[in-house]
């Protein structure tokens, strides 16, 4: 049986995540009391005819604070039933969460006459800290629309051909912020920038003219060699430590040229020696 626990601050996309999982064959339970997590795992093993082999639950700040603070021991108890259990934590920056609540006019579950929306969001962060700290996978939804979030969840959680650590190599642009879910970040802004070549500006790192230009730059090749040498040595150590997910982020200024080129090459190289390597370009 596989159990996915979905959590995150209100407005970060938990409902969308549950919808995606339900569409892909998961039996979904919204706002499960955290204290019932071990019982759910036990009943799922005993009554296999009643529950599907894939279950997803959301646990959020509507829980009792005492249950949320006990999440580490509750999770350990559930995993003690020998169930594959993944914790997905969704989040976005505070300005984005405020904007989403303003646009939808929904009420935050922790607001009241004495607590503003901004204060409720900060209180929620504290309450969900024990879950965030134990998340196997974190997805920053700040810059994602609904369709991108659905694709990201399917890519990271559902498209794993074999068990083991799932590696994601992701390009991004610093001007739109660093991905908060990255485990390793490499800054390639020091490399020659095709953006300043008028004939290359409208192309991306996926296009042959940009590929040819960057491949001819000695600094680019040296940077690629250094990064790939590091990753080939240390990523297997991540896998050996039973990490479920590892995200490697490659950043340039806009996320269109240098980071895309390096990310594509790294993905192709790592796929030759590691299982479950995926490539994503955040800002294309």
From Swiss-Prot:
Q: Does the keyword GTP-binding apply?
A: yes
GO-annotated molecular function: ATP binding; GTP binding
Where do the annotations place ATP binding?
8-15
Q: Which residues bind GTP?
A: 60-63
| Coiled coil ranges | none
Q: Which residues cross the membrane?
A: none
The keyword Nucleotide-binding is annotated on this UniProt entry: yes
| One Pfam family linked to the record | PapZ_C
InterPro entries reported for this sequence: P-loop_NTPase, RapZ-like, RapZ-like_N, RapZ_C
| Top-level taxon of the source organism | Bacteria
The alphabetical list of record keywords is:
ATP-binding, GTP-binding, Nucleotide-binding
**Role played:** Displays ATPase and GTPase activities.
The record's similarity note reads:
Belongs to the RapZ-like family.
Q: What is this protein called?
A: Nucleotide-binding protein PputW619_4266
């Amino acid at each position: 049986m596989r159990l996915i626990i979905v959590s995150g601050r209100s407005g970060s996309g938990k409902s969308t995540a549950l919808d995606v999982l339900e569409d892909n064959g998961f039996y979904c339970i919204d706002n499960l009391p955290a204290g019932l997590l071990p019982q759910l795992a036990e009943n799922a093993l005993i009554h296999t005819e009643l529950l599907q082999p894939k279950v997803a639950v959301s646990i959020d700040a509507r829980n009792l604070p005492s249950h949320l603070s006990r999440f580490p021991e509750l999770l350990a108890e559930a995993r003690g039933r020998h169930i594959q259990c993944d914790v997905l934590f969704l989040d976005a920056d505070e300005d984005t969460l405020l904007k989403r609540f303003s646009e939808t006019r929904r009420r935050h579950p922790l607001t009241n006459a004495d607590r503003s929306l901004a204060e409720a969001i900060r209180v929620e962060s504290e309450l969900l800290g024990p879950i965030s700290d134990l998340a196997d996978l974190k997805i920053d939804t700040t810059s994602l629309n609904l369709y991108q979030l659905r694709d990201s969840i399917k890519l990271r959680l559902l498209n794993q051909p074999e068990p083991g650590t799932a590696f994601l190599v992701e390009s991004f642009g610093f001007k739109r912020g660093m991905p908060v879910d990255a485990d390793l970040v490499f800054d390639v802004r020091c490399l020659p920038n095709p953006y300043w070549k008028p004939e290359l500006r409208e192309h991306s790192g996926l296009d042959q003219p940009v590929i040819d230009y960057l491949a001819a730059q000695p600094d680019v090749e040296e940077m690629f060699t250094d990064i790939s040498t590091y990753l080939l040595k240390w990523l297997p150590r991540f896998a050996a430590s039973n990490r479920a997910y590892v995200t490697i982020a490659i950043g340039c200024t806009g996320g269109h040229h240098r980071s895309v080129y390096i990310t594509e090459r790294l993905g192709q190289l790592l796929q030759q020696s590691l299982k479950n390597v995926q490539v994503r370009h955040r800002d294309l």
